[in-house]
């Protein structure tokens, strides 16, 4: 900074010294005022920067125009209206109608499949019924074959030789003629109750 020289007034030496003191005080006051003004300007600029940062933290006016913004809330949007609510209701109703139609189509397809499969189910049931009847008949026949044909109560135990019939229980076999004929010699012999063949021998068969 260039030095500025001010002419001193012509007078006594004491007056000159007093003038210099007053001049220096004025210079110091001016420098203090300049420093204070500079500090105030710096503080104002910092406050403005902080306010700008706070404003940037909140959505701008452009966010209202773009629903994709994180801050967008269509219910609080100033552009929201009853027409928008009606439009949403219409969209929901259309979605419901589409869903209902889809359900109805699936229901009809299921009914058709049930109608097609019903005859097959009936055939399977009929076949199962026939098989059951066959098994039942076999069990009945087997039960009859395992029951003594004389008393119709006890289980068969005696196997006749030579015809090989298993048709008598042991008590009924004892009640028959106890004589066993010798082949071609004795005419007084036991005969098979079923085929009337002479019995040459009897074997006790124990069934499980």
Curated annotation (Swiss-Prot):
Stretches assigned to coiled coil: 83-147
The keyword Lyase belongs to this UniProt entry's keyword annotation: no
Keyword Signal annotated: no
Residue numbers spanned by region Disordered: 1-87
Gene Ontology molecular function: any one: zinc ion binding
Keywords: Coiled coil, Metal-binding, Zinc, Zinc-finger
InterPro entries associated with the record: Znf_RING, Znf_RING/FYVE/PHD
Zinc finger (RING-type): 148-196
Protein name: Putative RING finger protein 413R
Pfam families in alphabetical order: zf-C3HC4_3
Superkingdom, natural source: Viruses
């Amino acid at each position: 900074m260039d030095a500025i020289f001010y002419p001193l007034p012509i007078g006594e030496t004491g007056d000159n010294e007093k003038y210099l003191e007053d001049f220096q005080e004025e210079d110091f006051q001016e420098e203090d005022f300049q420093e204070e003004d500079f500090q105030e300007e710096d503080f104002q600029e910092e406050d403005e920067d902080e306010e700008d940062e706070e404003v940037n933290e909140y959505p701008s006016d452009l966010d209202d125009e773009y629903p994709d913004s994180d801050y967008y809330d269509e219910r609080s949007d100033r552009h929201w209206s009853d027409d928008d609510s009606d439009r949403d209701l219409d969209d929901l109703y259309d979605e419901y109608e589409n869903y209902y139609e889809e359900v109805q189509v699936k229901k009809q397809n299921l009914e058709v499949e049930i109608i097609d499969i019903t005859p097959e189910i009936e055939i399977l049931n009929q076949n199962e019924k026939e098989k059951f009847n066959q098994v039942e008949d076999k069990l009945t026949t087997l039960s009859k074959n395992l029951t003594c044909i004389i008393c119709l109560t006890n289980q068969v135990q005696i196997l006749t030789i030579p015809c090989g019939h298993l048709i008598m229980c042991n008590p009924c076999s004892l009640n028959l003629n106890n004589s066993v004929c010798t082949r071609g010699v004795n005419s007084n012999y036991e005969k098979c109750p079923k085929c009337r063949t002479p019995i040459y021998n009897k074997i006790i068969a124990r069934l499980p």
